[in-house]
Design a protein with these regions (language model features):
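Conserved N-terminal catalytic core of the sugar/cofactor nucleotidyltransferase
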Residues: 3-4, 8, 35-95, 108, ...
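Short catalytic helix/loop segments, enriched in acidic residues and glycine
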Residues: 22-41
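Short beta-strand-to-loop acidic/aromatic patch adjacent to the donor-nucleotide binding site
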Residues: 94-104
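Conserved core of the sugar-phosphate nucleotidyltransferase
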Residues: 108-217, 228-232
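Conserved active-site beta-strand element of glycosyltransferases/polysaccharide synthases
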Residues: 224-227, 236
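Short, conserved phosphate/pyrophosphate- and ester-handling motifs at nucleotide-, phospho-/glycolipid
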Residues: 239
Length: 251
């Protein structure tokens, strides 16, 4: 069984108007029934057998009531790469799963089954990119609007959590710096991908294996795109409609 530490990403670049209108100082503290959104996430992580440690990153003042509820708190630097460096320096277990602060639908059962499936799917991988099929998501959650990539064989969405082995941190930091430096230039971003992939993606004939190859060629370590039959992993709370949607399910 994988031994995993959960990295709960609690940063927030700005407080959006719809969150202010809910009377919350942060997305994590949005009320869903009798609990805050972060409570659902922490409860699920705590009850997942493979997760042995929970690390929370964010603003200390926002999370003052939660610092004692996690194993380690890391102050947010407001820079993705710098945060990743700090997290890597504190990593203890063989695997880390990165979890955003806005995925309250993922239950401990889903986490457990997902990690077990990843272990069976590729026991020696360094990176597991979870992928949801549009058909699965819309069958279970009709009406929810997600962004999908059109690939050969269907429409797919990258899941909101991803799993890595501890040894991948240096490569993740290196590649994260490249992405950060290129983020405002379409030309620079395009240069990160081989021409064959750009061509296939434009024609919607790229496959999941093609996507894997691009990533593996960059990190020089084994990684897989893992098709997951759990639509909850695809649903995050990015807008008021999403909040209303998860409230209907959880309350």
């Amino acid at each position: 069984m994988f031994e995993i530490e959960a990295i709960l990403l609690g940063g927030q670049d700005k407080l959006e108007d719809w969150i202010k209108q809910e009377g919350a100082p942060h997305k994590a503290l949005l009320q869903i029934g009798e609990k805050k959104m972060i409570d659902y996430i922490l409860e699920s992580l705590r009850n997942t057998p493979q997760i042995k440690r929970i690390v929370l990153t964010g603003d200390r003042e926002i999370y003052k009531d939660y610092i004692e509820k996690v194993d380690l708190f890391i102050d947010d630097t407001h820079n993705f790469v710098d945060n990743l460096i700090k997290i890597s320096e504190k990593a203890e277990l063989p695997y880390s799963v990165f979890v955003p602060i806005d995925v309250p639908l993922i239950t401990s059962e889903i986490y457990e089954k997902t990690f077990s499936y990843c272990e069976e799917f590729c026991p020696d991988c360094y990176l597991y990119v979870l992928v949801n099929n549009k058909k699965d998501v819309e069958e279970k959650f009709p009406g929810t609007k997600r962004t999908y990539w059109r690939l050969k064989g269907g429409y797919y969405k990258m899941g909101n959590i991803f799993l890595i082995r501890k040894e991948l941190y240096p490569k993740a930091i290196e590649y994260g710096k490249i992405l950060f430096e290129s983020r405002k230039s379409a030309t620079k971003l395009a240069s990160l991908f081989p021409l064959w992939f750009i061509f296939k993606a434009a024609l919607h004939i790229a496959t999941l294996r093609d996507c894997e190859k691009v990533v593996v060629d960059k990190i020089k370590l084994n990684g897989r795109a893992v098709p997951i039959p759990y639509p909850e992993i695809a649903v995050d709370v990015d807008k008021k409609d999403d909040l209303d949607f998860v409230r209907k399910i959880l309350t």
